[in-house]
Structures are given as C-alpha cells and as structure tokens.
Amino acid sequence: MYDLVVDVRARLGQYVGPFDVSNVRVLGYGHLGDGNLHLNVSSPDGYHAELEKIIEPFVYQWTADRRGSISAEHGVGAMKPGELRHSKDEASIEAMRRIKDVFDPRGILNPYKVLPPRKAGPGSKL
C-alpha cells in the first residue's frame, strides 16, 4: 500500500514543466487495521493547481489498477463525488444511493456531497 507514496515520488521525479517539484513532500499515513492510506502532498510554496494536475489523475488510476477505493471513512467529500467512479461501478453507486434514500428520503443531508449525481436515462431519478 505504501508503494503509492514511492510511485508518486517517482512520478514527480519524471515531471518536466514550469512547476518546481524539487521541494514537494509526499507522505503516507493511515490505518493499518482497515488498510487505509492517506496521501499528503505538500509544497513549501503552498497549493498549486499544476501540482494537483500532475498527481491526482495518477493516484486515481494507480488505485483503480489495484482495485482499491479512493474513499474510506471520510467519503469523497463535496469536491470529488464524481471521482468515486474510479473505484466503484455504477451498480455499487446505485446501491449506495438506495441506502442513502432509506435514511434520507428527502435528500436534505449533504445533498450532492456524498455520491455523484445520477446519470440521466430511462427510468433514472434525478
């Protein structure tokens, strides 16, 4: 699991572009009991969209290739519900929606922040 940290560091080492990655730190920490790894990537210069563009798609693909999940005990949050499709198929996401519908039938608890929106199509509820 910690191989992700090593592989992200290697990915940064291959980067050629306008953003200086020489001082970027990549650390992993998590929960051994349930196999969660939190990836912390930081730059002394603060947040850079370029750094996110270098790393984020790589991490999603790396995780999908190993049949992992990009979410764990904290969920995917408000900014990335659509990214759940990297590690869960549509049937699994629909099962999650149905469970949520049981406990939140009016959709008032964190609307659009937990699961990606339903794809429009025959028989879909939007």
Predicted regions and their residues:
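Conserved glycine-rich FAD pyrophosphate-binding loop
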Residues: M1-L126
